[in-house]
């Protein structure tokens, strides 16, 4: 099931960044294979995170499409995957560290996404998504 597209990722990070981050040759031509891989990763990540929640997974599309917050989260995660998986390294004090070390271009966006997903999982915010008929059926249980 596909929830997001390249244009959704571009809405979060910009088309120039998505093209540059997806092109491992150092150019600025979007690599559709890597973009598809980032979409697959992001969609599976969010689905797996919500699988044991009160929400039905896969998520159901409403009359106006998928919940805009879900689309934003998946798009942000897909863009972060593209950014972190570029294989680019930088030097600091003669030690190579990953560019995606928490100081990268996507770190603030991902911090926001994690906070919002945590709020949805804890019930502090409610998504426009179908709920399971029995949310505890797949969650942990205790028998005495």
Regions found by a protein language model. Give the residues of each.
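Conserved short "hinge" loops at termini or chain/domain junctions
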Residues: 1-68, 125-144
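Short loop/turn elements at secondary-structure junctions
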Residues: 76-144
């Amino acid at each position: 099931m596909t929830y997001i597209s390249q244009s959704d990722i571009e809405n979060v990070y910009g088309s120039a960044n998505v093209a540059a981050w997806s092109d491992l040759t150092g150019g600025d031509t979007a690599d559709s294979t890597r973009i598809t891989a980032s979409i697959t990763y992001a969609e599976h990540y969010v689905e797996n995170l919500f699988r044991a929640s009160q929400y039905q997974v896969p998520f159901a599309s409403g009359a106006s499409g998928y919940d805009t917050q879900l689309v934003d989260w998946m798009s942000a995660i897909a863009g972060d995957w593209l950014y972190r998986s570029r294989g680019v390294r930088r030097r600091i004090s003669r030690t190579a560290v990953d560019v995606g070390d928490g100081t990268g271009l996507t770190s603030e966006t991902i911090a926001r996404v994690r906070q919002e997903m945590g709020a949805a999982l804890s019930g502090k915010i409610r998504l426009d998504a179908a709920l399971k008929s029995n949310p505890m059926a797949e969650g942990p249980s205790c028998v005495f």
